[in-house]
Amino acid sequence: MNRTSESVEPQQNEKTAVHWSREWVPVVVDTYSNEDDEDNEEGDESRPQRTFLVKRWVQDNVQVEKKGDEETAAADN
């Protein structure tokens, strides 16, 4: 994973003026341990997870379109 790519400010494209901001984004990470956890019950197959807050560049006012909508729009053209 290239950590520097996330910390570099995105470049503005004049044709598609997108506003960017730095925001805290929750990232869920599965944690595994080879040791038996004392607090886990016997037969518990759940995977322990930890949530970290990471500051990343995100687009302001982004509307997420479904992939199917893009395909139908391309077919209409």
Swiss-Prot record:
For region Disordered, the annotated ranges are: 1-20, 31-52
Inducing or repressing factors: Differentially expressed during meiosis.
**What organism is this sequence from?**
Schizosaccharomyces pombe (strain 972 / ATCC 24843) (Fission yeast)
Residue stretches of biased makeup (Acidic residues): 33-44
Compositional bias, Polar residues, is annotated for 1-15
This protein's source sits in the domain of life called Eukaryota
Protein name stated in the entry: Uncharacterized protein tam8
Q: What lineage is on file? A: Eukaryota, Fungi, Dikarya, Ascomycota, Taphrinomycotina
